[in-house]
Amino acid sequence: MGSRRITLLGALFAVLAVAIEGRTLLTHNLKAEAAETVDAVSSVVAGSAGRQLLVSEPHDYNYEKVGFDWTGGVCVNTGTSKQSPINIETDSLAEESERLGTADDTSRLALKGLLSSSYQLTSEVAINLEQDMQFSFNAPDEDLPQLTIGGVVHTFKPVQIHFHHFASEHAIDGQLYPLEAHMVMASQNDGSDQLAVIGIMYKYGEEDPFLKRLQETAQSNGEAGDKNVELNSFSINVARDLLPESDLTYYGYDGSLTTPGCDERVKWHVFKEARTVSVAQLKVFSEVTLAAHPEATVTNNRVIQPLNGRKVYEYKGEPNDKYNYVQHGFDWRDNGLDSCAGDVQSPIDIVTSTLQAGSSRSDVSSVNLMTLNTDAFTLTGNTVNIGQGMQINFGDPPAGDLPVIRIGTRDVTFRPLQVHWHFFLSEHTVDGVHYPLEAHIVMKDNDNLGDSAGQLAVIGIMYKYGDADPFITDMQKRVSDKIASGAITYGQSGVSLNNPDDPFNVNIKNNFLPSELGYAGYDGSLTTPPCSEIVKWHVFLEPRTVSVEQMEVFADVTLNSNPGATVTTNRMIQPLEGRTVYGYNGAAA
């Protein structure tokens, strides 16, 4: 009986794959064919041992019994003009500006906290292990998404996520995807019943790390068919677990709920870029559905609804909203970022034989490290971003003289703000050679800390393979221990690594600076978007050492925080464009 069940499920996958790979809408006839296949599957599975049926009431609607649309009064709004889902035709999209001032006047969705790696949905997470695997949660109250509708700003709070499987609800240019997730958000404005839904498509490919974690956690805490299964210690980060990896372009339109009563009070946001899902993960959805509803089909999508004259608007993602090295490539010039295509860009190749004496640089002096190069300059109150780059955000600096650089006629005092790493390939090269690791200590004009265009100075530290770096060892162990204990999670920002009676402090001299302080200095830019050309670079030429094991930890943190990312985080070398690179403290040729 088990083999027959597998054969029939395979037949269903084949039917659905024909529709999806053929880039055609799933028609009523094809749906009927799929339904017949599932009828056979359901009759076989009905006697399966060990299957837990739903003990409480199922949905009062069912895709198999009522059909793939809601007729006969089940959907109170059937026949009205703004129903969902729809087929999104990308060659007939309207620009977002055309939506403003119209009857459906709606702004771009401000994702706000949903883009943050620290925005965690963790409180009272519960999942419904029946058809659609809906799970609910309490979202944070701060930094919520916003839409301006008819001149009124609405703040939206995420309330639940569910899935439509084996055939997506929306189609894009006639193509149905094998899975579509819907995150439902409710307006927090008094008296408003407005909803906003984010739709995420999945295409066949590698397993999705979040779905893997969700399904495994759910299965370990309950049985298929159970309702309100609590997922203890389960966290959801929307940026990492749900949103597309790189392109945040979405299609927006006015529509409805896709299940009874199909209320027309939804602002839809269907994202263009698809995530991936494996066949094995889709099989879990089928098992859950059949356990909860033995008479049901494993597809739970409503048929495409007529557009009825509505416009669908394209909201192009800002390239620097969420950048990712594997998705955007190793440069930002080809991603519509004009600010990354200037003539004073970083990183560069430092050719030591052509370094000019620092004394010949008339408008910029050497950096006077002052107390930064002492045992006494210890930064406390530091926090860490557990993600790509492993950034340490420095607390307030101790009393004492901060580093000084004379720029033009002004002595500029710089405050250290943070340090982060670029790994497996350094960003700068020295005589054409990449190092495995490069740290960047970012400092800002202390008199203009609030100015986004304020002068920056960055100290670059190279690492070569060798002995483990003691400071990196301590940092990585603290991260690993706290993740293992559940105190923090991958992708979180601003976490403390302090232990009782053992604070996580940073001393620049002992933890970062090499013993020889010769460095190359030049005018450049940030190496990540927006690539602002406001940086005085100081790349120290004597490397520290890092072990292979430490590099592996950087890779693990990156992949756990950014599924789909590459473990290299370097921008490609930029042209010098006539700039002079200077040598200081004996580094000149």
From Swiss-Prot:
Every Alpha-carbonic anhydrase domain range: 59-316, 321-585
Highest classification ranks of the organism: Eukaryota, Viridiplantae, Chlorophyta, core chlorophytes, Chlorophyceae
Enzyme class: lyase
Catalytic activity as recorded in UniProt: hydrogencarbonate + H(+) = CO2 + H2O
Binding site for Zn(2+): 420, 422, 440
PROSITE patterns: ALPHA_CA_1, ALPHA_CA_2
Protein name as catalogued: Carbonic anhydrase
Highest taxon of the lineage: Eukaryota
Keyword Flavoprotein attached: no
